[in-house]
């Protein structure tokens, strides 16, 4: 999906923000927040602090100010500060790429943990957000009522070599072509294979 901007975590990885900790913080910042906000906010934070120790050394007020354009920034500041402290206490200044470890942090769910592991470590995992869920069901590639069920269906059906790429490709595709309402079917490059499940109006 080259014509459209990359999803935020993949773009940040291209810019050199590839550590587990950096990707995790960017993922937390991205929750309920547009990529157009996530990217500059993450860059601003990382210009000030990129490691657990550096983030832990920030005051809560400074951290909150750095991420304030993000939705629910006060809650996220609490989560990020707590995670930084736990990482420093348990691991020093490097967060391991372990799924169970990521899921143990408050506010980190399977979607975020999988995305971080896929981008930061190349771990074969699938991250299903609203775009991946919508597009794969609209295609009728899977038939699932929730993102969680879509994840299980994709893990069964999708070849493992595509597990990381499905998020990288379908997030921008879902944002710019296969949108939630009135998808741009007239300019869709894969219209011929799409079953258009649930589509009542399109452009």
List each model region and its residues.
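N-terminal polyanion-binding entry modules of DNA glycosylases/AP lyases
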Residues: 1-97, 161-162, 169-203
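Catalytic DNA-binding helix-loop module of base-excision-repair DNA glycosylases/AP lyases
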Residues: 23-29, 80-86, 95-140, 150-153, ...
